[in-house]
């Protein structure tokens, strides 16, 4: 209670909190933690640190077993910030603050959102709690339960190729069910929880040039969805992976983590190529049970302009306007060699559909994959 001793957490409080984590394990129930405290009661010395350590261990043990939601309603300081950030979803009130070791920097909800720490920022504490309730209502109780199913009405918006990522997601998913996470952070990726045909799904839209932040944003979300067997629907319009600050080796490592997240996921995975899928992006996002493409998609190992230089360079020799011809040849390459029809011949695409039919195709595909089961080689986890 922030009104009593600044909400300082004592050893007795910590033991009380740890008991709730134990109950969540025994009952397979989601855990919602509300933070509004100025930190630990430091006068208790090492004892309070040991108690906090028990809570952090319990939170780690609970990860992937039941959904954990952190609601930052006020101050969230020090080890409490560590605990909040270990949750699956962090919801912050607009006037709340979160920092670990130094209060001199920007600890506002806006800063946490910009840094990708806060998944959702709400107007006030009451709205944050309401959002946590909504999350609990759409997520499975635990990793052995299925997500709630409800009647899903189609959105009134028509699917169009030129739509913004979040608008396309809203048009395909059930009306008024899209809950975007980490909005405004790493804009090359849009992630959301929603329902399609009444069932909860995780939706990813990858666009532009995927960089370190967007790849990590997607990878973390895919792992979260896989933990609770939520199907993952991925829309792809990626021109390739960009170098991170000019360090090409770092880009390769981060891209490999993204590819691993998709490869490791055993939940139902559907990929829809709505635009470009160039190079490693086509491979990483293409690790799915069903790969669908719109007719105008471009799926290629190289960008069309680069491919023209490699494969059709002879056609450029002696051209009066080489730049213009290069553009024309790149367009031709995209429509022929890099078309989804060629990808289908190479077994990289299972179905090519009219964009207007995207929602109905996804509903059918999700029904088909509902009973998917995968056995893995025995191991603790990927290294």
Show which residues each predicted segment covers.
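Ligand-binding clefts of soluble mixed alpha/beta catalytic domains
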Residues: 1-383
């Amino acid at each position: 209670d922030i009104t009593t001793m600044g909400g300082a957490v004592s050893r007795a409080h910590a033991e009380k909190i740890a008991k709730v984590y134990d109950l969540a394990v025994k009952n397979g129930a989601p855990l919602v933690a509300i933070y509004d405290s100025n930190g630990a009661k430091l006068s208790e010395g090492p004892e309070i640190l040991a108690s906090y350590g028990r809570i952090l261990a319990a939170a780690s043990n609970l990860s992937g077993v039941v959904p954990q939601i952190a609601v930052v309603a006020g101050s969230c300081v020090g080890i409490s910030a560590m605990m909040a950030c270990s949750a699956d979803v962090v919801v912050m009130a607009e006037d709340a603050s979160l920092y670990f070791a130094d209060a001199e920097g920007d600890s506002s909800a806006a800063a946490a959102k910009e840094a990708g720490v806060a998944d959702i920022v709400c107007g006030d504490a009451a709205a944050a709690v309401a959002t946590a309730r909504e999350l609990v209502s759409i997520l499975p109780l635990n990793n052995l339960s299925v997500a709630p199913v409800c009647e899903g009405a189609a959105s009134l918006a028509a699917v169009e190729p030129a739509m913004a990522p979040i608008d396309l997601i809203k048009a395909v998913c059930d009306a008024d069910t899209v809950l975007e996470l980490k909005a405004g952070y790493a804009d090359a990726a849009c992630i959301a929880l929603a329902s399609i045909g009444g069932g909860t799904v995780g939706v990813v839209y990858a666009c532009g040039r995927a960089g370190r932040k967007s790849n990590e944003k997607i990878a973390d979300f895919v792992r979260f969805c896989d933990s609770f067997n939520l199907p993952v629907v991925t829309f792809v319009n990626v021109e390739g992976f960009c170098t991170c600050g000019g360090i090409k080796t770092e880009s390769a490592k981060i891209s490999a983590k993204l590819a691993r997240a998709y490869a490791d996921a055993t939940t139902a995975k559907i990929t829809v190529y709505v635009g470009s899928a160039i190079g490693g992006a086509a491979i990483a996002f293409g690790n799915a049970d069903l790969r669908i493409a719109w007719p105008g998609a471009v799926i290629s190992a190289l960008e069309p302009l680069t491919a023209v230089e490699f494969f059709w360079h002879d056609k450029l020799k002696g051209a009066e306007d080489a730049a213009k011809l290069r553009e024309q040849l790149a367009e031709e390459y995209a429509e022929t060699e890099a078309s989804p029809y060629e990808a289908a011949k190479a077994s990289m695409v299972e179905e090519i559909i009219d964009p207007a039919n995207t929602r109905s195709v996804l509903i059918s595909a999700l029904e088909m994959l509902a009973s998917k089961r995968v056995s893995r080689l025995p191991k603790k986890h990927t290294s």
